[in-house]
């Protein structure tokens, strides 16, 4: 009988392989208004995540999300993939997007980079991974989402409430209408039909500790 640690290690390898074989990751570039090619993405088995967070409105210069894959017992493993939902060169008041291989994902960490330090919202860590975080096991992701081949998925707006050093809450709301309306203007390739599929908040891991990391 396989031990739990062996099953987790095997799950990490499978999760990493699924990302490596399934396609590519992408983030917005303010100069790239023609990509992505949805037909090509569908052929590659990839889709597009469109998302917003409450951090977009809190003076963050960058907002990133650390992705994880589900494993045994409802836990999630950091697979070493981070997507940028807001970048310094992104158009104002526009949701972020990422090109991802089709599949199920969890977000285990949201990071706000702003003057004075980084504000980090992280799910509960069960077992630490490597120095760069790959392989870290979390009790449950903060939110989950699903993408199908060739889909533009409107996954909603993740609302994070609570101050650093306190317990914080996670909820999912609609992306503000004004932001959605700006999306096809900023990025013509995303003018097609979106699949509205809001992220889900798991029953476990929906509240964790927030921390402020000082800038080095």
Question: Where are each of the predicted segments found?
Answer:
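Sec-dependent bacterial lipoprotein signal peptides
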Residues: 1-24
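Alpha-helical interaction segments
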Residues: 14-15, 95-96, 169, 177
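Primarily secretory-pathway and cell-envelope proteins
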Residues: 25-82, 112-216
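Tryptophan-paired
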Residues: 72-103
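A short tyrosine-centered beta-strand micro-motif
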Residues: 102-110
